[in-house]
C-alpha cells in the first residue's frame, strides 16, 4: 500500500533517534495520519505477507472480552505470549475495556454493545467512541493499550472509523493494526446495515525500531501489489456471532514474509 510506504519514508527521513522502554532504540516522529477507502479493497499489506489468521483471531478475542492467551494459543496465535503471566493472564487489557469497562461506581459497561446500539439508533451522534485507555486500570495491564481510542462516523449510508494510536511500531504492529480495524469496521457495517466507508489511522509516537530499519528498507524496494478483497461467508446479525470461518480473503498476492524481532 502506498500509504504505508509513505509512512515508512516519512519516519526514516524525519524521525529522531530516541531511547525507549524496551532498550532497543527507535527512529521516532510524532503525529501522522493515513486514510484507506474500504471500497477500494481490503487494506492488508502486500510488501510483505501478513498472517491473517493472527489478525482475525486477535480481533475475535478482543470482541469476546477475553484477556487470557489460551484462546489465541489454541488457534495457533502467539503474538501475546511474551506479555502473559504463568497462567496466561494479561490483566484488564483490550477485551476487558471494550466489553466490561469498570466505572467509578463499580458498574461495568459493554462499550461494543453500546456502540452498535448507538450506530443503529442515532447514527449522527458524535459520541460513537470506544476507549481502551482506562486510567484507573493501566497499572494492572501487562501492556497499556497502544491503539487506545476509536470513533465511528456515519454518512451517506457508509460507516467510517478513525483510530488514535498513541504508540505505533511501524514494521510489526502497524500492518496488523490497519487490517484489524479495517476488518472491525467492515464487521460493524455489516451488522448495522451500512456499507464500509473509510478507515482513518492517526498516530501519536510512530516509530521504527533500530533493529527493523533493514527490513523496512527492503519493503521500500518492493512494488505495491493490488489489494485483496474480503467478504463474509454468511449473513451475521450480531457482531459477537462472527467466527474465523466467516472471513474470506480473495486475491491476496503479497511479497514474501519478512522476519523481525519483537521488542518487549
UniProtKB/Swiss-Prot annotation:
It is found in: Cytoplasm. One of its GO terms (molecular function) is thymidylate synthase activity. Pathway: Pyrimidine metabolism; dTTP biosynthesis. DUMP binds at residues 21, 126-127, 166-169, 177, 207-209. CDD domains: TS_Pyrimidine_HMase. Its EC number is 2.1.1.45. (6R)-5,10-methylene-5,6,7,8-tetrahydrofolate binds at residues 51, 169, 263. Catalyzes the reductive methylation of 2'-deoxyuridine-5'-monophosphate (dUMP) to 2'-deoxythymidine-5'-monophosphate (dTMP) while utilizing 5,10-methylenetetrahydrofolate (mTHF) as the methyl donor and reductant in the reaction, yielding dihydrofolate (DHF) as a by-product. This enzymatic reaction provides an intracellular de novo source of dTMP, an essential precursor for DNA biosynthesis. This is Thymidylate synthase 2. The lineage of its organism: Bacteria, Bacillati, Bacillota, Bacilli, Bacillales. The gene is thyA2.
